[in-house]
Amino acid sequence: MEYVSGGELFDYIVKNGKLQEHEARRFFQQIISGVDYCHRHMIVHRDLKPENLLLDHNMHVKIADFGLSNMMLDGEFLRTSCGSPNYAAPEVISGKLYAGPEVDIWSCGVILYALLCGTLPFDDEHVPTLFRKIKTGIFPIPEYLNKQVVNLVCQMLQVDPLKRANIEEIKKHEWFQVDLPSYLFPSNIEQDSNVIDTYAVQEVCDKFGVKDTEVHNALLSEDPHDQLAIAYHLIIDNQRFADEAAKAEINNFFVAGSPPPKL
């Protein structure tokens, strides 16, 4: 288990109120990077909120509390109404079927609003009234928010899940793209399926107490839900993520260390 010393993003918002746009964007980019990672590995969180987003000593966001998360299966839908009411999507509180990613997108939209405004878009002490507000999808838009971010928030807080922005649309949005660190979305380099990383295999063996032949068999089975195969690919992804982050740090170092231009 990892110790995260910076506390909850919720406490940070309570202490600081609405954040400067550049800081809100930096947090939001990291949140979307983490949610995208979960969704690519067929996991839907279902309880995203600032209380479940932790900050490390470098003020990097860590997604926590997967107690209500679920695995997504092709062609199957979820119905369970779960999560915190203020961050729950209309289809969740209405007991409708949902695929999964779209409810996390709604929650991320609420979080983005909270980062920028210091308040929630939908709030009421009376739960039935709160639910009515969520189902209408109508919320106040402060005048100080720029048009780009208002456009993004509105796309994410679409009542109709079919019209709601998806991860790819968020990643391509002009507001989201500003100062976006490349390591948050490392390039998806296709690997030769015949080449197996022996380091990653050994790490899986150490963590699960299995033999390397079992890991090889899991990879050859091509079962997307095999825990050994999932662990292997997580290790590969984490290594690629770390490599991209290291490259970004080196680039930033050389840029910062460049001599000033001659006058």
Regions found by a protein language model. Name each.
Residues 1-180:
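Eukaryotic serine/threonine protein kinase catalytic domain
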Residues 111, 259-260:
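A short, hydrophobic secondary-structure junction motif
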Residues 162, 168-259:
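C-terminal regulatory tails of eukaryotic serine/threonine kinases
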